[in-house]
């Protein structure tokens, strides 16, 4: 298992992985229409490139030379000392093999290197990953509903972890 930071050149891999992961991971949480809308809005190559231009850092996790998942995070966002974990996904057939934990540890270590003391994330209130994040030390700080257009919303918990 190897985690590799990537540049814009490898973003098509992230886009392709998201299209394999999302329909399975979110099928019992949001509608198929919302999954398609969010993939097209947030994981199109142009959207991912825009993320990089805004300061998001992406990394892939590989095993056997093949990409199995990814994360993205931003340091000193929205304030100095705070980091936001924007994305953390692993192929469903690779769950429970330590890859999500490794990606999360990578993002936290990178945040620490940049003098951050807190990392936060948004997660759908119905997402079973909440238990994973709680096990890793995150706590629910607030709830928020975000209008993402076309009549869709993200109904999320905001979770934080500090060190």
Regions found by a protein language model. Give the residues of each.
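Short coil/turn segments at alpha/beta junctions that flank glycine-rich nucleotide-binding fingerprints
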Residues: 97, 114-117
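Acetyl-CoA-dependent GNAT
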Residues: 5-11, 15-93, 104-106, 110, ...
């Amino acid at each position: 298992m190897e985690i590799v930071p990537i540049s814009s050149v490898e973003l098509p891999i992230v886009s392709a992985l998201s299209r394999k992961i999302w329909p399975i991971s979110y099928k019992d949480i949001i509608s198929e229409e919302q999954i398609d809308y969010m993939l097209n809005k947030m994981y199109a190559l142009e959207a991912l490139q825009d993320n990089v231009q805004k300061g998001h850092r992406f990394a892939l996790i590989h095993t056997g030379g093949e990409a199995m998942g990814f994360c993205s995070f931003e340091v000193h966002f929205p304030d100095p000392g705070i980091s936001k974990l924007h994305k953390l996904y692993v192929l469903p057939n690779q769950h429970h093999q330590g890859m999500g934990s490794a990606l999360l540890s990578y993002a936290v270590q990178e945040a620490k290197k940049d003098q951050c003391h807190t990392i936060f994330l948004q997660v759908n209130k119905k997402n079973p990953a909440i238990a994973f994040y709680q096990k890793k030390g995150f706590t629910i700080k607030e709830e928020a509903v975000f209008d993402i257009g076309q009549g869709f919303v993200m109904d999320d918990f905001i979770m934080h972890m500090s060190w």
